[in-house]
């Protein structure tokens, strides 16, 4: 917990006359502490938007995943049902969610075809660069994970990517359209056609990899799960397209991070050893549980949960401040909640802001290793690995080997923006 940041938040509150019920934001006012996407941000649509060809990327449901996972065992449906029961999972429950998702995907496809739009339906394995080039727009039919997958192969900043939550009861869908359009997708298409929406240009992180023994070939973590291989073995398997080199200059990796990049040892119980340089500053040796670099989009995902503080911790800090004689106001639940919420909301920023928020997870601080900044905004971050079995994971789905001698450079470039839409509820 960053206690100095909490104290700064507390000072800001004291300096205001803030002990009144918060007023409701006006219609045209940005909500305090929230990214602009939550308050109707983005840029107005220049006329309507009506694609001719759309690719729909459908998520793999848990039911489909379990089927694929044991496909080599040639299990019958009854065998699968019994196996899931042994693991404490409900076969009927998984099948029900699968049917709900499938029905909503069919609704999306039928709605598109009713408008005369050519449609391709693909799953993860069929989704490739050729499919993206064919389409005028990409629709992610699933949840946030499917949206991240769909965005990962779209490098053209002018090609829209739209998320539709196909199971709102079980999926949050922060990156998707409001849930009402799950069952009313024709209405969404009409609003697109009339220009009744706003573009949101989400910034993404581009990655360069250089150094000794690097391998720029990615590993699909979803496919790895299906292969039942442990992550520590992922980079030891023999691959035809292995492009490992003894030493090389910077190579631009074929993915962009919409949410975040995580760097750390594959075995979470092992400390990650690396050197870090922020905005071309001096290199600093660190040991920690890894580091997270996020965009404004990802600031309310993993990064938020790494950095957020609990009300209990805030109350403890305020009690210490009161004992030191620095707190004159009465300590009550309202004060604790106000400080907690303001601090946590300060961790969020607009998806359109061209900056990276990096966070060090559980830094080790002693006479050898330091952590001068546990969390900081930056425009460029470079990391040199001193790890043994580490990985660099993009949006939780694509992994790159990142061991001793490898150097990763991460930055924001306007060319990498992702074009998404905002529709009102």
Swiss-Prot record:
Positions of post-translational N6-acetyllysine modification: 59, 300, 380
Keyword Zinc: no
Regulation: Inhibited by NADH, NADPH and NADP(+).
GO biological processes: NAD metabolic process; NADP biosynthetic process
GO CC annotation terms, alphabetical: mitochondrion
Residue positions, PTM Phosphoserine: 171, 350
Transmembrane segments: none
Highest taxon listed in the record's lineage: Eukaryota
Modified residues (N6-succinyllysine): 59, 285, 300
Role: Mitochondrial NAD(+) kinase that phosphorylates NAD(+) to yield NADP(+). Can use both ATP or inorganic polyphosphate as the phosphoryl donor.
Catalysed transformations (reactions): NAD(+) + ATP = ADP + NADP(+) + H(+)
Transit peptide interval: 1-45
Major localisation: mitochondrion
Keywords of this entry: Acetylation, ATP-binding, Kinase, Mitochondrion, NAD, NADP, Nucleotide-binding, Phosphoprotein, Transferase, Transit peptide
SUPFAM superfamilies referenced in this protein's UniProt entry, alphabetically: NAD kinase/diacylglycerol kinase-like
Enzyme Commission number(s) from the entry: 2.7.1.23
Gene Ontology MF terms in the entry: ATP binding; NAD+ kinase activity; protein homodimerization activity
Pfam families: NAD_kinase (PF01513)
Subcellular location per the Swiss-Prot or TrEMBL entry: Mitochondrion
Protein name: NAD kinase 2, mitochondrial
Subunit structure: Homodimer.
Annotated spans, Disordered: 20-46
Family that this chain belongs to: Belongs to the NAD kinase family.
């Amino acid at each position: 917990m960053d206690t100095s940041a909490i104290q700064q938040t507390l000072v800001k509150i004291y300096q205001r006359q803030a002990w009144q019920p918060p007023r409701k934001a006006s219609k045209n006012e940005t909500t305090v502490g929230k990214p602009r996407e939550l308050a109707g941000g983005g840029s107005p649509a220049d006329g309507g938007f009506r694609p001719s060809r759309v690719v729909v990327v459908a998520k793999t449901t848990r039911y489909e995943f379990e089927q694929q996972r044991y496909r080599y065992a040639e299990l019958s449906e009854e065998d699968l049902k019994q196996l899931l029961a042994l693991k404490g999972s409900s076969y009927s429950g998984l099948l029900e969610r699968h049917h709900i998702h499938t029905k909503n995907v069919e609704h999306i496809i039928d709605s598109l075809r009713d408008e005369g739009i050519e449609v391709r339906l693909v799953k993860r394995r069929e989704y490739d660069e050729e499919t993206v080039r064919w389409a005028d727009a990409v629709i992610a039919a699933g949840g946030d994970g499917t949206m991240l997958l769909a965005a990962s192969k779209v490098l053209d900043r002018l090609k829209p990517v739209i998320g539709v939550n196909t199971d709102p009861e079980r999926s949050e869908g922060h990156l998707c359209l409001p849930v009402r359009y799950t069952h009313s997708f024709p209405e969404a298409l009409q609003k697109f056609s009339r220009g009744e929406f706003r573009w949101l240009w989400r910034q993404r992180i581009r990655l360069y990899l250089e150094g000794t023994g690097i391998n720029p070939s990615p590993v699909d973590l979803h496919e790895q799960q299906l292969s039942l291989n442990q992550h520590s073995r992922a980079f030891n398997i023999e691959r035809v397209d292995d492009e490992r080199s003894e030493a090389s200059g910077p190579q631009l990796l074929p993915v962009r991070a919409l949410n975040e990049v995580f760097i750390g040892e594959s075995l979470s119980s092992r400390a990650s050893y690396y050197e870090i340089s922020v905005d071309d500053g001096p290199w600093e040796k660190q040991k920690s549980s890894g580091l997270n670099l996020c965009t404004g989009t990802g600031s309310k995902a993993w990064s938020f949960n790494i950095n957020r503080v609990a009300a209990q911790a805030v109350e403890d800090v305020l009690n210490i401040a009161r004992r030191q004689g620095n707190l004159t106001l009465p300590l009550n639940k309202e004060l604790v909640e106000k400080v907690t919420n303001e601090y946590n909301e300060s961790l969020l920023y607009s998806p359109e802001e061209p900056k990276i928020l990096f966070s060090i997870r559980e830094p080790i601080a002693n006479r050898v290793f330091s952590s001068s900044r546990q969390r900081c905004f930056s425009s460029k971050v470079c990391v040199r690995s001193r790890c043994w079995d580490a990985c660099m994971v993009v949006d939780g789905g694509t992994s790159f080997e990142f061991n001793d001698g490898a150097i990763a450079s991460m930055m924001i470039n306007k060319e990498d923006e992702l074009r998404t839409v905002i529709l009102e509820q």
